[in-house]
Regions:
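Conserved C-terminal portion of the radical SAM core fold
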Residues: 147, 202-206, 228-291, 299-323
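Flexible, acidic/Gly-rich N-terminal and inter-domain linker regions that tether
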Residues: 1-100, 303-304, 310-318
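Short Fe-S-cluster ligation motifs
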Residues: 136-155, 321, 375-380
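Distinct, well-ordered alpha-helical segments
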Residues: 159-166, 187-197, 256-264
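Flexible mid-to-C-terminal extensions adjoining Fe-S/redox cofactors in radical SAM and related proteins
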Residues: 2-15, 329-380
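Structural recognition of alpha->loop->beta junctions
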Residues: 192-210, 262-277, 336-361
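Canonical Radical SAM [4Fe-4S] cluster-binding loop centered on the CxxxCxxC motif
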Residues: 95-131
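Core AdoMet radical
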Residues: 118-131, 142-157, 169-189, 199-231, ...
Length: 380
């Protein structure tokens, strides 16, 4: 687990920090028109020409305005993209070069209100997040390979989303994108067509589907009519040749219908590019709703195995996210993916002696103590 934000100490700032998004660099990268924040190391504290300097200590002489980094951000490295508060007193890591997973928040608004949502919706104007996302994309190093676009529900801001995707196409055409959406806006054939016409080379939309029928799905997402719109959205995207991933969060309501949902997908949506069966992150709305959603993963292994076998037999690529190998049926290990983002990923003390630790995805630090009671080290 790593910290992604911390308090900085401004040194010699002439005023407010502008712009608010910077790429961290070192001596191998010469100053350009891009906002580059030079990460000062021992012996190179007099490199001139950069708009901002990042230091590890208070007594470093630099030829320009500087921010002294907190100890929690000592992991910053060249290529990372950071956000800096206008007064220079807070730094947030927005994209990390060494991270396995990077994602950009586009909005906290949503037209679903899922019982287990890890990012509870907020009804406020956050259109500035799309502008920041464009700045982040513009600063990504050429070594960047993938980026997640998440919310909230990004498609609520249709024009801003299309504009961002066009910016990605024109600025980082090699980048693999993964857009999280509830899929409902894609039921509008006109919007689905606009999305497809952007012409991105490598983008997938991850869309949740929680039941094989409207009643339960709409209850889980707390939005009447959502099931029909989501399914029509998936169909529209597929008809336009767009990549779609169906995401199923395995929780107390979905476990009893998991095999039926797998059959529904196998029979009606077998063309999707991937299905992700996802362990529950016990944060956000999942905490106050824990009695409604929590189930120990050890108690649904039969259903998870049956659902996986149904999907695989139908030729649907299947992945299992956010599960620990010691809890999974060993027949499911080939489908398990290390999927938890670095900043909220950790291992328990008992994991240190586990023979498969390096292949295991670990646990959510955000889930607190709400973890399976069957976690254990696997002997050699």
């Amino acid at each position: 687990m790593i910290k992604l934000s911390g308090r900085a100490k401004p040194i010699g700032l002439p005023g407010l920090v502008d712009p608010g998004v910077w790429r961290v660099c070192q001596a191998s990268e010469t100053p350009t028109e891009h906002p580059l924040a030079y990460l000062v190391r021992d012996g190179d504290d007099h490199v001139p020409g950069y708009g901002l300097y990042l230091t590890q200590g208070p007594d470093v002489a630099v030829p320009g305005p500087a921010l002294q980094l907190p100890a929690d951000l000592a992991h910053l490295a060249a290529g990372d993209v950071i956000g800096v508060a206008p007064d220079g007193r807070r730094i947030t890591v927005l994209w990390k070069q060494a991270a396995t997973h990077n994602s950009v928040l586009l909005t906290e608004q949503c037209d679903n209100y899922c019982l287990m949502c890890s990012q509870p919706p907020k009804d406020r104007d956050d259109a500035w997040l799309f502008d920041r996302a464009k700045q982040i994309v513009s600063l990504l190093p050429s070594s960047a390979r993938s980026l997640g676009l998440t919310g909230g529900e990004p498609t609520l801001h249709a024009d801003a989303l299309i504009d961002l995707l066009e910016h990605c196409r024109d600025t980082t055409p090699w980048l693999q994108l993964h857009l999280l959406s509830n899929g409902r806006r894609f039921a509008d054939a006109g919007f689905a067509t606009r999305y497809a016409q952007v012409g991105l080379a490598d983008i997938m939309v991850g869309i949740p589907l929680y039941a094989p029928e409207a009643g339960l799905h709409d209850f889980i997402v707390q939005a009447q009519g959502a099931f029909d719109e989501t399914v029509r959205g998936i169909l529209n995207l597929a008809s336009l040749g767009q990549c779609v991933e169906i995401r199923i969060v395995v929780q107390l309501h979905t476990v009893p219908v998991l095999t039926d949902l797998a059959l529904f997908i196998a029979r009606n949506l077998p063309f999707v590019d991937q299905v992700a069966l996802m362990g529950l992150e016990m944060t956000g709305l999942a905490r106050p709703n824990s009695a409604e959603v929590w189930i120990d993963p050890a108690n649904y292994q039969r259903e998870l195995l049956e659902a996986t076998q149904i999907l695989v037999t139908a030729g649907v690529a299947t992945r299992i996210y956010n599960h620990q190998l010691c809890v999974l049926d060993e027949r499911l290990w080939p489908y398990a993916v290390r999927s938890i983002s670095d900043w909220k990923n950790d291992y328990l003390d008992i994991c240190q002696m586990c023979s498969v630790r390096d292949a295991c995805g670990g646990v959510f630090t955000t889930s607190g103590n709400r973890l399976s009671q069957q976690l254990r080290p696997i002997p050699p």
